[in-house]
Amino acid sequence: MTHMINIQPRKPRFDLSDVPVFWNDGDPVLTRFFDALSIHFPDGERFFIQSVRNYQDLVTDPKLREDIKNFFRQEAQHGIVHDQYNAVMQSQGIHVEKVIARFKLFIRHSQKHLPAKYLLDMTAAFEHITAVLGEGAMEGEGEMFKNAHPAMRAMFMWHGVEEVEHKTVAFDVYETAAGGGYFTRASALIIGTLLVHAVVGSVLWHMLKIDKLQGQPLVLAKGFYRLYGPRGLITRLIPLSLIHI
């Protein structure tokens, strides 16, 4: 097994009542990028839990069994908190259910037609991606959310810490209970990375159009440069992303 970090479920509370629309340093792109992630988290977390639960009874190692239970607790709490923030986005004019309808359809079709082993492998890949984002959130004293609204900064930092804590649980279950396999692991990470960028990019652009910012190239260029420039918040995470392959 690869997991040695203690997984500690927490139940924090965040006051999201006064979160502004552009809560991350007043930057529309920086804000909506993380909004586009958040809006998918509740359904994504439930997908991850079910994918691991499919193999839970095949795990015999006591430490991993305990890690699985704490993984479930952490992921369930993530879903609850991001549902709360999604309600804030709804009140600010984002039609949450409409935005995530295709994502929900993708999950239903995947669970119906794909093998349980590949669903677990996809979960391990997505967990790697979210853990990399979590490590990025903590990098440089929290530079990713340095000037964010305090409650949003606390929410994403808490989520990031827990993603790092349980980052290898799905992978350990995949290796010990599902038989592992390099090819499917590598392909799942590649497909998962492309899927995350496609889905998040599409929703990000949809939100920016709702904000009527598609006609403000300087605002958009500044925000995307902060994410994907040579030292962008996402660009600098690429080396960490490749470790899983």
Where are these regions (language model features)?
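Conserved small/polar residues in nucleotide/adenosyl-binding loops
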Residues: 243-245
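Conserved alpha-helical segments that form or flank metal/cofactor-binding pockets of metalloenzymes
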Residues: 2-8, 72-99, 166-174
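Alpha-helical scaffold segments that form or flank carboxylate-/histidine-based iron centers
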Residues: 31-40, 62-77, 115-123, 148-162, ...
